[in-house]
């Protein structure tokens, strides 16, 4: 079972992930204006010297800025997490995201591309066109990441997700696993399950969804005094437990 851990922003954290045997080690770039960071470059270089793969999420959609990121860091995987559908269906903006991903793929054929496919939270899977979205992006993707998109009580998915307006993820909530399993079953590329996965639920998720791999971010982060996850601070013990439980599922 492949494991993927996100918000690894320093070489020291990357070294721990490598020691744990994490296959995909992910970093996040928050904005295009400060996209070239020496600490992140050192992190990617640390991963490059191991058997693990580096993955990067740019939280922006400017083609030139994304090219700067790829040229500077040379990651193994570029991860797109743009928001492109809601409960009404596939949004018109999806065409721009398909075009952007195709342009990046054409310019960097050696670069693996991961595409986040939004899945509503548990019990609301029918309100998002997750399977249709996967069919659209499969020809230009090497991996899918199934991540949670919050659908409100009125069954409307909104654009302002916790990861930032226009992007999917960072909810800390499990997705609808029945929908996720359907995406796995129809897909011809590896599918990684994300969305609220923790040491306590990862084995159940694996048995239910049967993904190629599992991803954790918020639920393996350190906690504040209110037991809320702290962004960009990993809890190494929770991460170790997550990896061990995923492998023994």
For the regions a protein language model found, what residue spans apply to each?
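Short amphipathic alpha-helices and their capping/turn segments at secondary-structure boundaries
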Residues: 12-19, 67, 128-140, 202-209
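Conserved anion-binding
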Residues: 26-33, 48-188
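Glycine-rich beta-strand-to-loop/alpha-helix junction loops that act as flexible
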Residues: 57, 81, 192-197, 214-219
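A generic "structured core" feature
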Residues: 145, 153, 191, 212, ...
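A C-terminal functional module that forms or caps the active site or interfaces directly
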Residues: 192-210, 221-224
């Amino acid at each position: 079972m492949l494991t993927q851990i996100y918000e690894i922003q320093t070489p020291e954290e990357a070294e721990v992930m490598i020691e744990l045997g994490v296959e995909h080690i992910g970093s996040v770039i928050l904005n295009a204006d400060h996209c070239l960071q020496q600490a992140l470059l050192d992190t990617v270089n640390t991963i490059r010297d191991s058997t693990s793969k580096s993955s990067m999420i740019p939280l922006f959609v400017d083609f030139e800025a994304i090219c700067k990121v790829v040229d500077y860091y040379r990651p193994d995987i570029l991860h797109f997490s743009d928001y492109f559908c809601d409960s009404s269906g596939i949004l018109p903006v999806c065409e721009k995201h398909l075009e952007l991903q195709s342009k990046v793929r054409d310019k960097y054929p050696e670069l693996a591309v991961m595409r986040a496919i939004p899945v509503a939270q548990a019990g609301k899977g029918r309100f998002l066109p997750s399977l249709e979205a996967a069919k659209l992006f499969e020809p230009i993707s090497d991996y899918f990441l199934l991540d949670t998109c919050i659908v409100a009580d009125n069954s409307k998915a909104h654009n302002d997700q916790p990861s930032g307006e226009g992007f999917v993820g960072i909810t800390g909530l499990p997705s609808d696993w029945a929908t996720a399993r359907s995406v796995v079953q129809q897909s011809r590329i590896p599918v990684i399950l994300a969305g609220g996965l923790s040491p306590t639920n990862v084995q159940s998720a694996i048995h239910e969804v049967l993904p190629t791999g599992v991803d954790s971010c918020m639920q393996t982060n350190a906690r504040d005094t209110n037991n809320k996850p702290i962004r960009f601070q990993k809890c190494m013990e929770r991460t170790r437990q997550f990896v061990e439980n995923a492998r023994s599922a």
